[in-house]
Amino acid sequence: MAVIFVMATTVAASAQDEPEYKLEIGAGTGLVSYVGDYNSNLLKGMKPWLVLMGKYRMDPRTALSLNIGTGKIKTKEFNHRITEADLRLEYNFWAYGTGNEYRGAKRFTPFITAGLGATFYGGPEKGATMNLPIGAGVKYKIGNRLNLTAEWAMRFTMSDKLDGSKDPLGIKSSGLFKNTDCYSALQIGLTYDLWEKCKTCYQE
């Protein structure tokens, strides 16, 4: 019994000593597709997508995520590159972590994300527009400092020129997103934890 007690005490102490981290940095890849005047199918014309990401963990359930992505959107009518930068809020349905640094945290959790960004597009009507990314995904902590994520997010833009043409079909509509182009990205990413949290900074 004494041996079991000593082992349990040692495991508990090592769990409490496991560091927490505030920051994640990493990269991902996936597929991007355009929805607009020349395409209404999310799964049609998907092209390679690359993304760099950084996340600041505010607590085990929420994080701020900065993303920079690039890829091509293409149909038979056009072939343009888009590059985006956005800032999002991520909300985890369950507290996220190894369960050692934060009691009750889980290695796996689904999450939702939304934010605000900018999209830069090429072509004859090249320019920039705001985008509103909204999506969902899952994340899994595959190691003490390694995180695997999979997510899908739709970007609602305020431009009808991502495809190089403004309202070529003469569609009548009104409102903030009047006949604007959108695009979505399905991606997987790998991030690494940095910036160890000080556990004694607020202790007397």
Model-derived regions, located:
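Short glycine/proline- and aromatic-enriched beta-strand/turn motifs that initiate or cap beta-hairpins
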Residues: 15-57, 191-197
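Outer-membrane beta-barrel strand-turn architecture
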Residues: 19, 56-60, 93-95, 120, ...
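Residues on the lipid-exposed face of transmembrane beta-strands in outer-membrane beta-barrel proteins
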Residues: 27-31, 52-56, 87-91, 114-118, ...
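Outer-membrane beta-barrel translocator domains and adjoining extracellular loop/strand segments
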Residues: 37-42, 75-79, 101-103, 123-128, ...
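Glycine- and aromatic-enriched membrane insertion/assembly motifs of diderm outer-membrane
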Residues: 40-92, 155, 168-173, 187
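Gram-negative (and chloroplast) outer-membrane scaffold detector with strong preference
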Residues: 60-126, 192
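Predominantly the C-terminal beta-signal and adjacent terminal strand-loop region
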Residues: 73, 82, 142-204
